[in-house]
Amino acid sequence: MEELQGYLEKDRSRPFLYPLLFXEYSYALAHDRGLKGSLFYEPTEVFGYDSKSSLALLKRFVIRIYQQNYFLSVVNDSNKNRFVSHHHNNFXYSHXYSQMISEGCAILVEIPFSLRLXSYFEKKEIPKSHNLRSIHSIFPLSEGXLLHLXHVSDILIPHPIHMGILVQILQCWIQDVPLLHFLRFFLHKYHNWNSFLITPKKSIYVFSKENKRLFWFLYNSYVSECEFLLVFPRKQSSYLRLTSFGLFLERRHFHVKMEHLQMQHLILIVVCRDYFQGTLWSFKDPFMHYVRCQGKAVLASKGTHLLMKKWKYNFVNLWQYYFHFWYQSYRIHINQLSNYSFYFLGYLSSLLKNSLTVRNQMLENSFLMDTVTNKFETIVPVIFLIGSLSKAQFCTVSGHPISKPIWADLSDSEIIERFGRMCRNLSHYHSGSSKKQGLYRIKYILRLSCARTLARKHKSTVRTFLRRLGSGLLEEFFTEEEQVLSLILPKTIPFTFYGSHKERIWYLDIIRINDLVNHS
Protein backbone atom coordinates (compact mmCIF):
# COMPACT_ATOMS: atom_id res chain seq x y z
CA MET A 1 0.00 0.00 0.00
CA GLU A 2 2.86 2.37 0.84
CA GLU A 3 4.54 1.55 -2.48
CA LEU A 4 1.34 2.35 -4.35
CA GLN A 5 0.95 5.66 -2.53
CA GLY A 6 4.54 6.57 -3.28
CA TYR A 7 3.96 5.72 -6.93
CA LEU A 8 0.95 8.02 -7.05
CA GLU A 9 2.83 10.84 -5.33
CA LYS A 10 5.75 10.44 -7.73
CA ASP A 11 3.84 11.12 -10.89
CA ARG A 12 0.17 12.07 -10.85
CA SER A 13 -0.05 12.67 -14.58
CA ARG A 14 0.47 9.03 -15.54
CA PRO A 15 -2.65 7.10 -16.54
CA PHE A 16 -2.80 4.87 -13.46
CA LEU A 17 -6.53 4.85 -12.74
CA TYR A 18 -7.72 2.74 -15.64
CA PRO A 19 -5.01 0.03 -15.36
CA LEU A 20 -5.58 0.09 -11.62
CA LEU A 21 -9.12 -1.12 -12.23
CA PHE A 22 -7.84 -4.41 -13.64
CA UNK A 23 -4.71 -4.85 -11.50
CA GLU A 24 -4.84 -7.76 -9.10
CA TYR A 25 -3.27 -6.00 -6.10
CA SER A 26 -5.49 -2.95 -6.41
CA TYR A 27 -8.46 -4.60 -4.75
CA ALA A 28 -6.69 -4.27 -1.42
CA LEU A 29 -7.66 -0.61 -1.62
CA ALA A 30 -11.20 -1.55 -0.68
CA HIS A 31 -9.95 -2.57 2.76
CA ASP A 32 -7.79 0.50 3.32
CA ARG A 33 -9.62 3.02 5.49
CA GLY A 34 -7.49 5.91 4.36
CA LEU A 35 -8.72 5.67 0.79
CA LYS A 36 -12.09 4.04 1.29
CA GLY A 37 -13.70 7.08 2.92
CA SER A 38 -15.12 10.02 1.07
CA LEU A 39 -13.28 13.26 0.45
CA PHE A 40 -14.96 15.01 3.34
CA TYR A 41 -14.25 12.34 5.96
CA GLU A 42 -17.94 11.50 6.27
CA PRO A 43 -18.77 8.04 7.60
CA THR A 44 -20.30 5.66 5.12
CA GLU A 45 -23.71 5.62 6.73
CA VAL A 46 -24.12 9.39 6.47
CA PHE A 47 -24.47 9.43 2.70
CA GLY A 48 -26.23 6.08 2.62
CA TYR A 49 -23.60 4.21 0.66
CA ASP A 50 -24.34 0.58 0.08
CA SER A 51 -21.88 -1.43 2.15
CA LYS A 52 -22.33 -4.40 -0.18
CA SER A 53 -20.79 -2.51 -3.10
CA SER A 54 -17.00 -2.52 -3.02
CA LEU A 55 -14.00 -3.22 -5.16
CA ALA A 56 -14.23 -6.86 -4.13
CA LEU A 57 -17.54 -7.13 -5.97
CA LEU A 58 -16.08 -5.18 -8.85
CA LYS A 59 -13.26 -7.71 -9.04
CA ARG A 60 -15.78 -10.54 -9.41
CA PHE A 61 -17.50 -8.64 -12.18
CA VAL A 62 -14.22 -8.08 -14.03
CA ILE A 63 -13.49 -11.81 -13.79
CA ARG A 64 -16.90 -12.56 -15.29
CA ILE A 65 -16.16 -10.15 -18.12
CA TYR A 66 -13.21 -12.31 -19.17
CA GLN A 67 -14.76 -15.71 -18.44
CA GLN A 68 -18.40 -15.49 -19.50
CA ASN A 69 -18.52 -12.20 -21.43
CA TYR A 70 -21.51 -10.91 -19.48
CA PHE A 71 -20.91 -7.30 -20.33
CA LEU A 72 -21.24 -7.75 -24.07
CA SER A 73 -24.41 -9.79 -23.67
CA VAL A 74 -25.94 -7.10 -21.50
CA VAL A 75 -25.03 -4.37 -23.96
CA ASN A 76 -26.43 -6.36 -26.88
CA ASP A 77 -29.65 -6.94 -24.99
CA SER A 78 -30.01 -3.29 -23.99
CA ASN A 79 -32.12 -2.43 -27.03
CA LYS A 80 -34.40 -5.47 -26.77
CA ASN A 81 -37.74 -5.77 -25.03
CA ARG A 82 -37.05 -6.28 -21.32
CA PHE A 83 -40.62 -7.18 -20.54
CA VAL A 84 -39.99 -10.61 -22.05
CA SER A 85 -39.21 -13.06 -19.28
CA HIS A 86 -36.20 -14.42 -21.16
CA HIS A 87 -34.36 -11.11 -20.84
CA HIS A 88 -35.49 -10.30 -17.32
CA ASN A 89 -32.42 -11.86 -15.72
CA ASN A 90 -30.05 -9.97 -18.00
CA PHE A 91 -31.69 -6.69 -17.03
CA UNK A 92 -31.32 -7.53 -13.33
CA TYR A 93 -27.67 -8.38 -13.95
CA SER A 94 -27.11 -5.08 -15.77
CA HIS A 95 -28.63 -3.11 -12.91
CA UNK A 96 -26.47 -4.85 -10.29
CA TYR A 97 -23.33 -4.65 -12.40
CA SER A 98 -23.86 -0.94 -13.09
CA GLN A 99 -23.87 -0.27 -9.36
CA MET A 100 -20.68 -2.32 -8.96
CA ILE A 101 -18.95 -0.34 -11.69
CA SER A 102 -20.23 2.93 -10.25
CA GLU A 103 -18.96 2.14 -6.76
CA GLY A 104 -15.60 0.95 -8.04
CA CYS A 105 -15.07 3.96 -10.30
CA ALA A 106 -16.00 6.33 -7.48
CA ILE A 107 -13.38 4.80 -5.19
CA LEU A 108 -10.74 4.97 -7.91
CA VAL A 109 -11.30 8.58 -8.96
CA GLU A 110 -11.29 9.67 -5.32
CA ILE A 111 -7.76 8.32 -4.81
CA PRO A 112 -5.73 11.29 -6.18
CA PHE A 113 -7.97 13.84 -4.48
CA SER A 114 -7.88 11.98 -1.17
CA LEU A 115 -4.09 11.96 -1.23
CA ARG A 116 -4.03 15.62 -2.18
CA LEU A 117 -6.45 16.44 0.62
CA UNK A 118 -4.35 14.65 3.23
CA SER A 119 -1.13 16.31 2.08
CA TYR A 120 -2.85 19.70 2.09
CA PHE A 121 -3.92 19.35 5.73
CA GLU A 122 -0.41 18.27 6.71
CA LYS A 123 1.23 21.15 4.86
CA LYS A 124 -1.13 23.83 6.15
CA GLU A 125 -1.31 22.26 9.62
CA ILE A 126 -5.09 22.65 9.68
CA PRO A 127 -6.72 20.76 12.55
CA LYS A 128 -9.60 18.46 11.67
CA SER A 129 -12.09 20.16 13.95
CA HIS A 130 -15.50 18.51 13.91
CA ASN A 131 -17.11 21.69 15.24
CA LEU A 132 -16.22 23.54 12.04
CA ARG A 133 -18.15 20.90 10.07
CA SER A 134 -21.39 21.55 11.90
CA ILE A 135 -24.23 23.04 9.89
CA HIS A 136 -25.23 25.20 12.85
CA SER A 137 -21.82 26.86 12.90
CA ILE A 138 -22.83 28.80 9.78
CA PHE A 139 -25.55 30.78 11.54
CA PRO A 140 -23.48 32.41 14.33
CA LEU A 141 -20.94 33.47 11.72
CA SER A 142 -23.66 34.81 9.42
CA GLU A 143 -25.32 36.68 12.25
CA GLY A 144 -22.29 38.87 12.83
CA UNK A 145 -21.75 39.49 9.10
CA LEU A 146 -25.28 40.03 7.78
CA LEU A 147 -26.08 42.77 10.29
CA HIS A 148 -24.02 45.24 8.26
CA LEU A 149 -25.01 44.13 4.74
CA UNK A 150 -27.66 45.56 2.45
CA HIS A 151 -28.58 43.09 -0.29
CA VAL A 152 -28.81 39.32 -0.59
CA SER A 153 -28.98 37.14 -3.69
CA ASP A 154 -30.39 33.61 -3.79
CA ILE A 155 -28.69 31.38 -6.36
CA LEU A 156 -30.07 28.02 -7.43
CA ILE A 157 -27.37 25.88 -9.02
CA PRO A 158 -29.09 23.75 -11.67
CA HIS A 159 -28.29 20.14 -12.41
CA PRO A 160 -26.43 19.74 -15.69
CA ILE A 161 -28.68 18.71 -18.53
CA HIS A 162 -26.28 15.99 -19.65
CA MET A 163 -24.02 13.65 -17.69
CA GLY A 164 -21.26 14.21 -20.22
CA ILE A 165 -20.77 17.72 -18.82
CA LEU A 166 -19.77 16.21 -15.49
CA VAL A 167 -17.19 13.99 -17.16
CA GLN A 168 -15.87 16.91 -19.20
CA ILE A 169 -15.11 18.83 -16.01
CA LEU A 170 -12.80 16.04 -14.87
CA GLN A 171 -10.56 16.48 -17.91
CA CYS A 172 -8.65 19.31 -16.25
CA TRP A 173 -7.89 17.16 -13.18
CA ILE A 174 -7.54 13.60 -14.49
CA GLN A 175 -5.29 13.03 -17.47
CA ASP A 176 -6.19 9.37 -17.78
CA VAL A 177 -7.94 9.40 -21.15
CA PRO A 178 -9.00 5.71 -21.09
CA LEU A 179 -10.71 6.22 -17.74
CA LEU A 180 -12.66 9.22 -19.03
CA HIS A 181 -13.75 7.27 -22.11
CA PHE A 182 -14.75 4.34 -19.93
CA LEU A 183 -16.76 6.66 -17.68
CA ARG A 184 -18.56 8.19 -20.67
CA PHE A 185 -19.28 4.73 -22.05
CA PHE A 186 -20.65 3.59 -18.71
CA LEU A 187 -22.95 6.63 -18.35
CA HIS A 188 -24.18 6.20 -21.92
CA LYS A 189 -24.97 2.52 -21.43
CA TYR A 190 -26.55 3.24 -18.07
CA HIS A 191 -28.93 5.63 -19.78
CA ASN A 192 -29.76 2.98 -22.39
CA TRP A 193 -30.37 0.34 -19.72
CA ASN A 194 -32.93 2.56 -18.00
CA SER A 195 -34.36 4.39 -21.01
CA PHE A 196 -37.60 2.41 -20.94
CA LEU A 197 -38.19 3.18 -17.25
CA ILE A 198 -37.25 6.85 -16.96
CA THR A 199 -37.51 9.96 -19.09
CA PRO A 200 -34.46 12.02 -20.08
CA LYS A 201 -35.48 14.74 -17.61
CA LYS A 202 -35.32 12.29 -14.70
CA SER A 203 -32.24 10.35 -15.79
CA ILE A 204 -29.83 12.37 -13.63
CA TYR A 205 -32.23 12.19 -10.68
CA VAL A 206 -32.45 8.40 -10.90
CA PHE A 207 -28.69 8.12 -11.39
CA SER A 208 -28.10 10.21 -8.25
CA LYS A 209 -30.34 7.88 -6.22
CA GLU A 210 -28.83 4.61 -7.42
CA ASN A 211 -25.17 5.67 -7.70
CA LYS A 212 -24.74 8.07 -4.81
CA ARG A 213 -20.99 7.92 -4.39
CA LEU A 214 -20.07 8.44 -8.03
CA PHE A 215 -22.78 11.04 -8.55
CA TRP A 216 -21.73 13.12 -5.53
CA PHE A 217 -18.13 13.05 -6.67
CA LEU A 218 -19.09 14.27 -10.14
CA TYR A 219 -21.58 16.77 -8.75
CA ASN A 220 -19.08 18.21 -6.24
CA SER A 221 -16.57 18.73 -9.02
CA TYR A 222 -19.30 20.47 -11.02
CA VAL A 223 -20.25 22.72 -8.09
CA SER A 224 -16.61 23.61 -7.47
CA GLU A 225 -16.42 24.85 -11.04
CA CYS A 226 -19.53 26.95 -10.42
CA GLU A 227 -17.94 28.45 -7.32
CA PHE A 228 -14.82 29.21 -9.31
CA LEU A 229 -16.92 31.48 -11.52
CA LEU A 230 -17.99 33.38 -8.40
CA VAL A 231 -14.58 33.53 -6.76
CA PHE A 232 -12.62 34.65 -9.79
CA PRO A 233 -14.28 38.07 -10.36
CA ARG A 234 -14.11 38.68 -6.63
CA LYS A 235 -10.39 37.93 -6.58
CA GLN A 236 -9.73 40.15 -9.57
CA SER A 237 -11.75 43.07 -8.19
CA SER A 238 -10.56 43.08 -4.58
CA TYR A 239 -8.09 45.68 -3.42
CA LEU A 240 -6.05 43.10 -1.51
CA ARG A 241 -5.39 39.44 -2.25
CA LEU A 242 -7.33 38.08 0.67
CA THR A 243 -5.98 34.77 1.95
CA SER A 244 -9.44 33.65 2.95
CA PHE A 245 -10.46 33.36 -0.67
CA GLY A 246 -7.38 31.33 -1.46
CA LEU A 247 -8.18 28.99 1.39
CA PHE A 248 -11.81 28.86 0.29
CA LEU A 249 -10.88 27.93 -3.26
CA GLU A 250 -8.41 25.32 -2.10
CA ARG A 251 -10.89 23.73 0.26
CA ARG A 252 -13.81 23.61 -2.16
CA HIS A 253 -11.80 23.07 -5.32
CA PHE A 254 -10.21 19.81 -4.18
CA HIS A 255 -7.26 21.86 -2.98
CA VAL A 256 -5.84 22.82 -6.33
CA LYS A 257 -3.73 25.90 -5.62
CA MET A 258 -4.61 29.03 -7.50
CA GLU A 259 -1.11 29.49 -8.85
CA HIS A 260 -1.18 25.91 -10.20
CA LEU A 261 -4.51 25.98 -11.98
CA GLN A 262 -4.91 23.63 -14.91
CA MET A 263 -4.77 24.76 -18.52
CA GLN A 264 -8.53 24.99 -18.87
CA HIS A 265 -8.67 27.46 -15.99
CA LEU A 266 -5.80 29.49 -17.40
CA ILE A 267 -7.69 29.92 -20.65
CA LEU A 268 -10.70 31.10 -18.71
CA ILE A 269 -8.58 33.58 -16.75
CA VAL A 270 -7.19 35.11 -19.94
CA VAL A 271 -10.65 35.47 -21.43
CA CYS A 272 -12.08 36.91 -18.24
CA ARG A 273 -9.30 39.44 -17.86
CA ASP A 274 -9.96 40.75 -21.33
CA TYR A 275 -13.68 40.70 -20.69
CA PHE A 276 -13.56 42.43 -17.31
CA GLN A 277 -10.74 44.84 -18.07
CA GLY A 278 -13.05 47.83 -18.37
CA THR A 279 -15.67 46.78 -15.83
CA LEU A 280 -13.75 45.37 -12.87
CA TRP A 281 -13.84 48.73 -11.15
CA SER A 282 -17.56 48.29 -10.54
CA PHE A 283 -17.00 45.04 -8.61
CA LYS A 284 -14.78 46.51 -5.90
CA ASP A 285 -16.86 45.61 -2.89
CA PRO A 286 -14.86 44.37 0.13
CA PHE A 287 -18.01 43.16 1.89
CA MET A 288 -19.02 40.09 -0.08
CA HIS A 289 -20.16 36.97 1.77
CA TYR A 290 -20.94 33.62 0.18
CA VAL A 291 -22.33 30.39 1.63
CA ARG A 292 -23.64 27.29 -0.11
CA CYS A 293 -25.28 24.02 0.80
CA GLN A 294 -26.02 21.43 -1.89
CA GLY A 295 -27.57 23.24 -4.86
CA LYS A 296 -28.48 26.52 -3.19
CA ALA A 297 -26.14 29.41 -2.50
CA VAL A 298 -26.56 32.80 -0.83
CA LEU A 299 -24.48 35.81 -1.86
CA ALA A 300 -24.74 38.90 0.37
CA SER A 301 -23.20 42.31 -0.20
CA LYS A 302 -23.05 45.76 1.30
CA GLY A 303 -23.15 47.30 -2.16
CA THR A 304 -26.05 48.74 -4.08
CA HIS A 305 -28.72 46.94 -6.07
CA LEU A 306 -26.96 47.95 -9.29
CA LEU A 307 -23.79 46.21 -8.14
CA MET A 308 -25.69 43.00 -7.44
CA LYS A 309 -27.30 43.15 -10.89
CA LYS A 310 -23.85 43.43 -12.46
CA TRP A 311 -22.71 40.40 -10.51
CA LYS A 312 -25.77 38.51 -11.71
CA TYR A 313 -25.30 39.52 -15.35
CA ASN A 314 -21.63 38.55 -15.49
CA PHE A 315 -22.17 35.33 -13.55
CA VAL A 316 -24.88 34.19 -15.99
CA ASN A 317 -22.69 35.01 -18.98
CA LEU A 318 -19.69 33.22 -17.53
CA TRP A 319 -21.87 30.24 -16.73
CA GLN A 320 -23.21 29.92 -20.26
CA TYR A 321 -19.77 30.42 -21.78
CA TYR A 322 -18.05 27.91 -19.53
CA PHE A 323 -20.63 25.10 -19.32
CA HIS A 324 -22.15 25.53 -22.78
CA PHE A 325 -25.77 25.36 -21.67
CA TRP A 326 -28.40 27.96 -20.94
CA TYR A 327 -28.71 29.32 -17.42
CA GLN A 328 -32.06 30.88 -16.54
CA SER A 329 -31.54 34.29 -14.99
CA TYR A 330 -34.68 33.91 -12.87
CA ARG A 331 -32.80 31.39 -10.73
CA ILE A 332 -30.93 34.31 -9.16
CA HIS A 333 -33.08 36.55 -6.97
CA ILE A 334 -31.80 39.90 -5.69
CA ASN A 335 -33.57 41.42 -2.71
CA GLN A 336 -32.99 44.03 -0.08
CA LEU A 337 -31.95 42.28 3.09
CA SER A 338 -34.08 44.42 5.39
CA ASN A 339 -37.30 43.46 3.55
CA TYR A 340 -36.64 39.86 2.64
CA SER A 341 -36.59 36.44 4.28
CA PHE A 342 -34.48 33.79 2.56
CA TYR A 343 -34.78 30.05 3.09
CA PHE A 344 -31.51 28.30 3.80
CA LEU A 345 -30.61 25.10 5.67
CA GLY A 346 -34.14 24.64 6.97
CA TYR A 347 -34.50 28.13 8.44
CA LEU A 348 -36.21 31.31 7.30
CA SER A 349 -33.60 33.97 7.98
CA SER A 350 -34.28 37.68 7.95
CA LEU A 351 -32.91 40.97 9.23
CA LEU A 352 -35.25 42.89 11.52
CA LYS A 353 -34.92 46.54 12.44
CA ASN A 354 -35.69 47.46 16.04
CA SER A 355 -36.28 51.12 16.82
CA LEU A 356 -35.39 52.30 20.29
CA THR A 357 -35.96 55.72 21.84
CA VAL A 358 -33.37 56.80 24.39
CA ARG A 359 -33.68 59.86 26.65
CA ASN A 360 -30.39 61.68 27.05
CA GLN A 361 -29.88 64.38 29.63
CA MET A 362 -26.99 66.82 29.66
CA LEU A 363 -26.95 69.15 32.65
CA GLU A 364 -30.39 70.72 32.67
CA ASN A 365 -31.24 69.88 29.07
CA SER A 366 -32.80 66.58 28.06
CA PHE A 367 -33.60 65.29 24.61
CA LEU A 368 -34.83 62.12 22.94
CA MET A 369 -32.70 60.11 20.53
CA ASP A 370 -34.09 57.48 18.17
CA THR A 371 -31.74 54.60 17.39
CA VAL A 372 -32.24 51.69 15.01
CA THR A 373 -30.57 48.34 15.62
CA ASN A 374 -30.51 45.31 13.35
CA LYS A 375 -31.29 41.83 14.59
CA PHE A 376 -30.68 38.57 12.76
CA GLU A 377 -33.69 36.31 13.19
CA THR A 378 -34.13 32.66 12.27
CA ILE A 379 -37.54 31.00 12.47
CA VAL A 380 -38.97 27.59 11.68
CA PRO A 381 -40.60 27.43 8.20
CA VAL A 382 -43.89 25.89 9.29
CA ILE A 383 -45.45 25.79 5.82
CA PHE A 384 -42.48 23.97 4.30
CA LEU A 385 -42.34 21.44 7.13
CA ILE A 386 -46.08 20.78 6.89
CA GLY A 387 -45.59 20.13 3.19
CA SER A 388 -42.86 17.60 4.01
CA LEU A 389 -45.08 15.94 6.62
CA SER A 390 -47.93 15.70 4.13
CA LYS A 391 -45.64 14.03 1.57
CA ALA A 392 -44.61 11.55 4.25
CA GLN A 393 -48.32 10.96 5.05
CA PHE A 394 -48.26 12.28 8.62
CA CYS A 395 -50.84 15.00 7.96
CA THR A 396 -52.90 16.58 5.23
CA VAL A 397 -51.80 19.53 3.14
CA SER A 398 -53.61 21.87 5.54
CA GLY A 399 -51.77 20.38 8.53
CA HIS A 400 -54.48 18.09 9.90
CA PRO A 401 -52.80 15.05 11.55
CA ILE A 402 -53.58 11.61 10.13
CA SER A 403 -52.46 8.10 11.00
CA LYS A 404 -49.47 6.36 9.46
CA PRO A 405 -50.94 3.12 8.03
CA ILE A 406 -47.65 1.45 7.14
CA TRP A 407 -46.50 1.72 10.77
CA ALA A 408 -49.67 0.19 12.20
CA ASP A 409 -48.17 -3.31 12.07
CA LEU A 410 -45.32 -2.36 14.40
CA SER A 411 -45.36 -2.73 18.16
CA ASP A 412 -46.56 0.13 20.34
CA SER A 413 -43.08 0.83 21.66
CA GLU A 414 -41.63 0.89 18.14
CA ILE A 415 -44.31 3.31 16.94
CA ILE A 416 -43.73 5.63 19.88
CA GLU A 417 -39.96 5.40 19.42
CA ARG A 418 -40.16 6.36 15.74
CA PHE A 419 -42.40 9.35 16.33
CA GLY A 420 -40.35 10.36 19.34
CA ARG A 421 -37.13 10.18 17.35
CA MET A 422 -38.59 12.48 14.71
CA CYS A 423 -39.63 15.01 17.35
CA ARG A 424 -36.25 14.93 19.04
CA ASN A 425 -34.41 15.36 15.75
CA LEU A 426 -36.59 18.32 14.80
CA SER A 427 -36.13 19.93 18.20
CA HIS A 428 -32.41 19.35 17.97
CA TYR A 429 -32.10 20.75 14.46
CA HIS A 430 -34.40 23.77 14.96
CA SER A 431 -33.10 24.69 18.40
CA GLY A 432 -31.69 27.89 16.92
CA SER A 433 -35.12 29.25 16.04
CA SER A 434 -36.00 32.66 17.46
CA LYS A 435 -39.64 31.69 17.83
CA LYS A 436 -40.60 28.23 19.01
CA GLN A 437 -44.35 28.44 18.33
CA GLY A 438 -43.95 26.97 14.84
CA LEU A 439 -41.88 24.12 16.23
CA TYR A 440 -44.58 23.40 18.82
CA ARG A 441 -47.14 23.11 16.03
CA ILE A 442 -45.03 20.58 14.14
CA LYS A 443 -44.53 18.55 17.30
CA TYR A 444 -48.27 18.67 17.99
CA ILE A 445 -48.95 17.26 14.50
CA LEU A 446 -46.52 14.40 15.10
CA ARG A 447 -47.91 13.75 18.56
CA LEU A 448 -51.50 13.50 17.34
CA SER A 449 -50.41 11.45 14.31
CA CYS A 450 -48.75 9.02 16.71
CA ALA A 451 -51.95 8.78 18.76
CA ARG A 452 -54.03 8.19 15.62
CA THR A 453 -51.62 5.47 14.45
CA LEU A 454 -51.86 3.68 17.80
CA ALA A 455 -55.64 4.04 17.83
CA ARG A 456 -55.80 2.65 14.28
CA LYS A 457 -53.74 -0.34 15.32
CA HIS A 458 -56.00 -1.11 18.31
CA LYS A 459 -59.16 -0.31 16.28
CA SER A 460 -60.24 2.44 18.62
CA THR A 461 -60.72 6.19 18.62
CA VAL A 462 -58.01 8.58 19.76
CA ARG A 463 -60.07 9.84 22.71
CA THR A 464 -60.89 6.34 23.92
CA PHE A 465 -57.30 5.17 23.49
CA LEU A 466 -55.81 8.10 25.43
CA ARG A 467 -58.48 7.85 28.12
CA ARG A 468 -57.69 4.19 28.66
CA LEU A 469 -53.89 4.50 28.74
CA GLY A 470 -53.62 8.06 30.00
CA SER A 471 -52.52 11.25 28.28
CA GLY A 472 -49.07 10.94 29.83
CA LEU A 473 -48.25 8.05 27.49
CA LEU A 474 -46.86 10.41 24.85
CA GLU A 475 -45.40 13.01 27.20
CA GLU A 476 -42.08 11.37 28.01
CA PHE A 477 -40.41 11.28 24.61
CA PHE A 478 -41.76 14.72 23.63
CA THR A 479 -40.15 16.37 26.67
CA GLU A 480 -36.81 14.58 26.53
CA GLU A 481 -35.20 17.33 24.45
CA GLU A 482 -36.36 19.97 26.92
CA GLN A 483 -34.83 18.02 29.80
CA VAL A 484 -31.53 17.85 27.95
CA LEU A 485 -31.58 21.61 27.39
CA SER A 486 -32.16 22.23 31.09
CA LEU A 487 -29.02 20.22 31.84
CA ILE A 488 -26.91 22.03 29.25
CA LEU A 489 -27.69 25.58 30.37
CA PRO A 490 -26.04 26.92 33.54
CA LYS A 491 -27.96 26.56 36.77
CA THR A 492 -27.70 30.28 37.47
CA ILE A 493 -29.75 31.11 34.38
CA PRO A 494 -33.47 30.54 34.88
CA PHE A 495 -34.69 28.51 31.94
CA THR A 496 -38.14 27.22 31.13
CA PHE A 497 -38.54 25.77 27.66
CA TYR A 498 -42.09 26.84 27.06
CA GLY A 499 -41.39 30.34 28.33
CA SER A 500 -38.23 30.96 26.35
CA HIS A 501 -39.61 31.42 22.87
CA LYS A 502 -36.62 33.50 21.77
CA GLU A 503 -33.84 31.40 23.29
CA ARG A 504 -31.57 30.16 20.51
CA ILE A 505 -29.16 27.28 20.93
CA TRP A 506 -26.77 26.21 18.18
CA TYR A 507 -25.34 22.71 18.31
CA LEU A 508 -21.92 21.85 16.92
CA ASP A 509 -22.57 18.16 16.29
CA ILE A 510 -25.03 18.44 13.37
CA ILE A 511 -23.31 17.42 10.14
CA ARG A 512 -26.32 16.62 7.97
CA ILE A 513 -29.64 18.24 7.16
CA ASN A 514 -32.76 16.83 8.73
CA ASP A 515 -34.66 14.53 6.37
CA LEU A 516 -37.90 16.53 6.63
CA VAL A 517 -36.02 19.75 5.96
CA ASN A 518 -34.18 18.22 3.02
CA HIS A 519 -37.45 17.25 1.30
CA SER A 520 -39.25 20.55 1.92
Curated annotation (Swiss-Prot):
<dbReference type="GO" id="GO:0006397">
    <property type="term" value="P:mRNA processing"/>
</dbReference>
<comment type="function">
    <text>Usually encoded in the trnK tRNA gene intron. Probably assists in splicing its own and other chloroplast group II introns.</text>
</comment>
<dbReference type="GO" id="GO:0008033">
    <property type="term" value="P:tRNA processing"/>
</dbReference>
<keyword id="KW-0934">Plastid</keyword>
<dbReference type="Pfam" id="PF01348">
    <property type="entry name" value="Intron_maturas2"/>
</dbReference>
<keyword id="KW-0694">RNA-binding</keyword>
<dbReference type="InterPro" id="IPR024937">
    <property type="entry name" value="Domain_X"/>
</dbReference>
<dbReference type="InterPro" id="IPR024942">
    <property type="entry name" value="Maturase_MatK_N"/>
</dbReference>
<dbReference type="GO" id="GO:0009507">
    <property type="term" value="C:chloroplast"/>
</dbReference>
<keyword id="KW-0507">mRNA processing</keyword>
<keyword id="KW-0150">Chloroplast</keyword>
<comment type="similarity">
    <text>Belongs to the intron maturase 2 family. MatK subfamily.</text>
</comment>
<keyword id="KW-0819">tRNA processing</keyword>
<dbReference type="Pfam" id="PF01824">
    <property type="entry name" value="MatK_N"/>
</dbReference>
<dbReference type="InterPro" id="IPR002866">
    <property type="entry name" value="Maturase_MatK"/>
</dbReference>
<dbReference type="GO" id="GO:0008380">
    <property type="term" value="P:RNA splicing"/>
</dbReference>
<dbReference type="GO" id="GO:0003723">
    <property type="term" value="F:RNA binding"/>
</dbReference>
<protein>
    <recommendedName>
        <fullName>Maturase K</fullName>
    </recommendedName>
</protein>
